[in-house]
């Protein structure tokens, strides 16, 4: 019996829990996702490459492991797409550039490897602007991705296909990239959650920018999760965090007494005005910080030229 369409919009945490409890199988969730893609993607144009034979094989293997009583990861059997700026072993990875239209990597970007090791199943790739260089999702190979809420609008960019896929229930979560808003803009435009991590805490090799491979760490780009809940972001970021190497973050534990912390609140700026509704949400967040006893400075600004 097919599972409810509503399951396609559940959080990753909810979907993974249901699979482990036997409420539905990984294969059933995958087939629901494929059904959603076949129904919605012709207009949405978010998912641009798929390997469904491999995805089905991996979903069946995931179900067999669970049936055998194997210890499984927190993302066991979860079907996902990945932004086409990241290398995925055995699945075409182009960066939105015609020069790489036949590029099929033999290895995964470390963040892709991390979520796969946690049990996720990569079924395909999502659209983006050429070399991730725009605030929309269009390129000469795959065309334009539209906003799932209004096809006359853009989904944002550069992780526009990723955000649209998550919002429309075509992927349980996504992995985006961000320099100047490429996770945050599309997450906002499509009504989902996105997080740009601090520099260095998530490995950025395997990112496709003007070349295949991405063997060096990006100097300004970061990679982060996109999902349908804040709880999912927490889980996914923990899985993506750098585990080894010279750039492993050594962050101090949060102090027990938060009143020793000082927060700079930069809520608006004449060079970048924001909507009143956004301002009210930010102001409420600052008020919550003040209510916990933190010191808030509303005048502090970074030492940069406007």
Feature names for model-found ranges:
Residues 15-21, 99-103, 221-228:
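Short, well-ordered beta-strand elements within core beta-sheets of diverse protein domains
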Residues 52-75, 82, 101-105, 115, ...:
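Flexible, acidic active-site loops/lids enriched in D/E/S/T/G that coordinate Mg2+ and/or position polar
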Residues 196-286:
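A short helix-breaking turn/cap at a secondary-structure junction
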Residues 74-111, 217:
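Enzymes and membrane/adaptor proteins characterized by extended Gly/Ser/Thr/Asp/Glu-rich
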Residues 26-30, 60, 248, 276-302:
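Acyltransferase
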Residues 1-57, 291-293:
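An N-terminal boundary/leader segment
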Residues 62-78, 232, 254-264:
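Immediate post-signal peptide segment of exported/extracytoplasmic ligand-binding proteins
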Residues 107-237:
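Short glycine/serine-rich loop segments
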């Amino acid at each position: 019996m097919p599972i409810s369409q509503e399951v396609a919009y559940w959080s990753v945490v909810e979907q993974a829990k249901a699979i482990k409890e036997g409420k539905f199988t990984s294969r059933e969730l995958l087939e629901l996702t494929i059904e959603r893609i076949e129904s919605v993607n012709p207009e949405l144009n978010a998912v641009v490459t798929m390997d469904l034979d491999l995805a089905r094989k991996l979903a069946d293997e995931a179900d067999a492991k669970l049936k055998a009583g194997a210890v499984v990861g927190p993302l066991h059997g979860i079907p996902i797409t990945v932004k086409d700026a990241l290398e995925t072993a055995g699945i075409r990875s182009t960066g939105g550039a015609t020069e790489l239209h036949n590029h099929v990597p033999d290895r995964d970007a470390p963040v892709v490897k991390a979520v796969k090791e946690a049990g996720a199943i990569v079924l395909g790739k999502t659209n983006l602007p050429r070399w991730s260089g725009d605030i929309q999702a269009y390129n000469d190979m795959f065309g334009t991705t539209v906003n799932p809420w209004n096809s006359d609008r853009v989904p944002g960019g550069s992780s526009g296909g990723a955000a649209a896929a998550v919002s429309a229930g075509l992927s349980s979560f996504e992995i985006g990239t961000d320099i100047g808003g490429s996770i945050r803009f599309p997450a906002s435009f499509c009504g989902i959650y996105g997080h740009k991590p601090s520099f260095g805490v998530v490995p950025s090799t395997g990112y496709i920018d003007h070349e295949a491979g991405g063997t060096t760490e990006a100097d300004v780009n970061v990679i982060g999760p996109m999902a349908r809940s804040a709880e999912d972001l927490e889980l996914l970021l923990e899985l993506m965090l750098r585990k080894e190497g010279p750039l492993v973050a050594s962050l101090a534990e949060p102090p027990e007494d938060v009143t020793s912390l000082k927060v700079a609140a930069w809520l608006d700026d004449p060079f970048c005005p924001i909507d009143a509704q956004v301002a009210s949400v930010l102001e409420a967040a600052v008020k919550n910080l003040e209510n916990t006893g933190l010191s808030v400075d509303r005048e502090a600004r970074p030492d940069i030229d406007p």
